[in-house]
Amino acid sequence: CIRDRCVPPESLELIHSKDPSRKTDGALIATAYYLKVLQLMHRFASLQGLKADAEEWEDLEHRMKDAFNARFLHIKEGTSPVPGHTLYPDSIFYGNNTVTANILPLAFGLVPKNYIHEVAKNAVTSIITTNKGHISTGVIGVQWLLRELSRRGHADVAYLLATNKTYPSWGYMVEKGATTIWELWNGDTANPEMNSGNHVMLLGDLLPWCFNNLAGIRADRWKSGYKHI
């Protein structure tokens, strides 16, 4: 079962969240990553000069992208995760409007151009309003979170998440004495004997964000390795 594991639970005492609104549809995640693989295959074929292969991968990518949006993109429908709050009629989001559900399509270039602003706005609203300025993604969503927020003009929100010291955050772990990344965002209270005290995947894109966005060091995606910075 594909899912966004290690989503921070709503309580410091819980090991796993019991709130279904925090969990992202596994089918959305799996399909988004299938599309990411198609994009990579298209790029690899192009880099090697395999024109026919590149065109074949690109055609499949475009057809899958249309199917993805037909299935998971919601326009002017649904309800807000904020209790008592009704969505504005122009609200546009993916899946059940979790941060991960919106960040993945944004990061993978799956959102139709005229909807990008609204989808990004919903991701930011979920972070600031629903989650009070804290991380709510698991190991999958967090891999793209900070860089995509910055790319969409919300570097201030990315910085807030990167520097928070209250639960759930990386800073919370540090404040509680962690020298490596815990398996659980609340590993000190939920399960101090958790399986992993060095769960590097939960670091997400914090380090790439520091290199790419804070330091401004980026590799050319159309050149192999780091041949062109």
Region spans (language model):
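Active-site core of glycosidic bond-cleaving carbohydrate-active enzymes
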Residues: 3-229
